[in-house]
Design a protein with these regions (language model features):
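Acidic, metal-coordinating helix/loop segments flanking the phosphotransfer/catalytic sites
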Residues: 9, 34-52
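Conserved acidic carboxylate
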Residues: 12
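Acidic phosphotransfer microenvironment of two-component signaling modules
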Residues: 15, 36-40, 107
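Two-component/phosphorelay signaling modules centered on CheY-like receiver
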Residues: 15-33
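C-terminal output helix
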Residues: 22, 100, 104-117, 121-126
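Conserved phosphotransfer microenvironments
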Residues: 56-71, 84
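As written
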Residues: 64, 92-100
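Hydrophobic/aromatic residues positioned on beta-strands within the core alpha/beta folds
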Residues: 80-81
Length: 128
């Protein structure tokens, strides 16, 4: 299993969305592993020790939902979707999950990610 203190999984099938997102995350000190399909996302979860995941629910091959529910509960997940109703249930039932509606701001996404990671670090300090 690959270990990296700031490794984020990005599951997005649209290259025109994925490429700038990955670059922006890297500019902000993250390492990124990418997946275009749900199957690749699930494989990345098995191979890597992640600090967070950014997942598009609507993929051409497979469902981002399958990846979201497979992410360990201690790992923060940001879901992005053009249909907020489809992700509302995931936000309710899966801890450490937030929705960012498409179209979204890369700045907002990174701010949300940093906030979620700070919350995770705080809760780990309270419960070692």
């Amino acid at each position: 299993m690959t270990k990296n203190a700031r490794l984020v999984l990005v599951v997005e099938d649209d290259l025109s969305v994925r490429r700038p997102l990955v670059r922006f995350l890297e500019m902000h000190g993250f390492s990124v592993v990418t997946a275009e399909t749900a199957e690749e996302g699930l494989e990345a979860l098995r191979k890597h020790q992640l600090v967070a995941a950014v997942i598009d629910l609507r993929l051409k091959r497979g469902s981002g939902r399958d990846v979201v529910v497979s992410v360990p509960t201690e790992v923060p997940v940001i879901i992005f979707s053009g249909l907020p109703s489809e992700s509302a249930e995931l936000e309710r039932v899966r801890p450490r999950t937030r929705l960012i509606e498409k179209p979204y701001s890369l700045v907002l996404l990174v701010e949300t990610l940093e906030e979620m990671l700070a919350e995770s670090a705080g809760s780990q300090n309270l419960h070692p």
